[in-house]
Amino acid sequence: MKRTIKTIFLALCYSAVTNGQTSTPIHLPAIFSDHMVLQQKSTVSIWGWGEASTTVKLVGSWIPNDTISTSVDDCGRWRTKIPTCGHGGPYTLQIFTDNRKENKIILKDILLGEVWLCSGQSNMEWSPNNGIHNRQEEIDNANHPHIRFFSLSKQGSKSPQEDCYAQWEQCTPEIMQKRSAIAYFFGKRLQQKLNV
């Protein structure tokens, strides 16, 4: 029984390391990318994958004198937390390793602000193109670079997924008309009320 459990554990570790990962020492899920928003005044979890036993370091430009360090575990995963200050930006987040200086990820145009999940039934995904009051006027005036979307496409799976196919997008008229109208107006209201 112990041998079976060890074999399963090793197989899971191998799967985690090789499942869609590149041969670079560190790799991030899509949720951590350029234009992302991190929750302000919080401690935010950041995670990814890499070569086992590699030290991963993070430096956010909002706390330039603090370096956060963690290690990649035997299954090829790493996770750490980074503190955030009040709303602002744009910032950068550098993620790098000691043993391979050439492997440095720099995420750009990061905002610290409010992060909300907008989810629900089919009416939640209706875009302004499905018909809203003053549709064209709202679309034409949808230049809000501090409102960001991270929209997931519909994908089925029989097991939990560790990554997704999506990217952060700044709110422009072109982007706004394709995204959730409810999410857009909610984000716009938050921006007006909270000044973020």
Predicted stretch roles:
Residues 1-23:
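Bacterial Sec-dependent N-terminal signal peptides
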Residues 21-196:
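Cell-envelope and extracellular/periplasmic
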